[in-house]
Structures are given as structure tokens and as C-alpha cells.
Amino acid sequence: MLHIEFITDLGAKVTVDVESADKLLDVQRQYGRLGWTSGEVPVGGYQFPLENEPDFDWSLIGARKWTNPEGEEMILHRGHAYRRRELEAVDSRKMKLPAAVKYSRGAKNTDPEHVREKADGEFEYVTLAIFRGGKRQERYAVPGSNRPQAGAPARSAATRAQGARPGAVAVQDEETPF
């Protein structure tokens, strides 16, 4: 029997028994849909393959998608809203990085120094997750979702924002009201 410790959306610690390792992600999804989290976000954010970004199951980390009043799709996690940012590939003498999608937010003065990342100027930010390179992991996808076609570009933030508002009123029965 495995045990996983969650922090509820109200800050209570709860230990849940898991029958076997192959049931672990199902349990994380179940409680993650309630906004419960297990563990801390690693410095630099969670790392996932880029191919998982379009249908990533945010409940695995206790997060969910949310559309703000301006129609921008964001990710809510532990009371913070994270923006989607597309990062271009870097190919220089010093560094070579493939294109990526990052979910981050502006740092707050209450954020610990070790999670803050420097940007241009004096601006600092905190990363929740970054999707870059790697091979797709089906276990990270929303169960039953249609896998995005290989080579199909992800919708840009502008395209999503234009079409996001009409669909924002649809609410699933399972969704929590936070």
C-alpha cells in the first residue's frame, strides 16, 4: 500500500492510501480536481514534454484551466493565476534550446527568493510549468482526450483569446466553484 500526502485547497494535510503504483496518477487526478496538491512546485517549474502541452491534465498537479474576464486562458494553482507564454528556440554559441511553452506569473514580494527568476529589467517571475522537447507521455494527457495531430501547431494565445469567451460559460458538474 502506498501513501500520498495532499494539501487541501484550505491548507489541511490529508494522507490518502493508494492500492498500487499503477493507481497513483488516478488518485492524483481525483484529488487534484478539488484543487488539492501533493508536494511543492520544483524550482524552475515542472518539466514536461512539449507534445503534452495542448491536452495536459492540469489536475495531476492540483491546477485547472480558467478564462479571465479578458478572455485569456490561464492556469489556476494554489490561488495564483499563471499565463501561457510561448518561448522561441534559442540557437547561439552559449546556448541551444528548442521552442517551449511556459506557464508563469509575476513574482510577489511574499515569494521565496529561490523560486524567483529574473527577466528583462527588474521584473521577476515564478514558473509553474514548462513544456519543452522530450517525447510525449500519454499518462500526462487528459484521459479520453483526442491526441493532437503530430505537426499541428498549438493555437496561439491571440487565437485562444478570441474564441475563449463564448465557451467560458460551460461548466462541468465535477468542476469545483473556486
Curated annotation (Swiss-Prot):
According to the record, the residues making up region (Disordered) are 139-178
InterPro entries hit by this protein: ssDNA-bd_DdrB-like (IPR024305)
What GO terms are given for molecular function?
Answer: single-stranded DNA binding
Q: What is known of its domains?
A: Contains a novel ssDNA-binding fold, which is structurally and topologically distinct from the OB-fold universally found in standard SSB proteins. The disordered C-terminus of DdrB may mediate interactions with other proteins important for DNA damage recovery.
Question: Which UniProt keywords are given for this protein, alphabetically ordered?
Answer: DNA damage, DNA repair, DNA-binding, Stress response
Q: Which gene encodes it?
A: ddrB
Comp. bias (Low complexity): 147-165
Subunit and partners: Homopentamer; arranged in a ring-structure.
The reply on keyword DNA-binding is yes
Q: Name one GO biological process term.
A: DNA repair
Note the superkingdom of the native organism.
Answer: Bacteria
Please give the record's induction comment. Answer: Induced to high levels following extreme ionizing radiation exposure. Also highly induced in response to desiccation stress.
This protein's species is: Deinococcus geothermalis (strain DSM 11300 / CIP 105573 / AG-3a)
Q: Pfam families from the entry? A: DdrB
Protein's name in the database: Single-stranded DNA-binding protein DdrB
Give a short account of what the protein does: ssDNA-binding protein that probably contributes to the ionizing radiation resistance of D.geothermalis. Plays a role in DNA repair and genome reconstitution, in a RecA-independent process, and is necessary for recovery from severe genomic fragmentation as a result of exposure to severe levels of ionizing radiation. Binds single-stranded DNA but not duplex DNA.
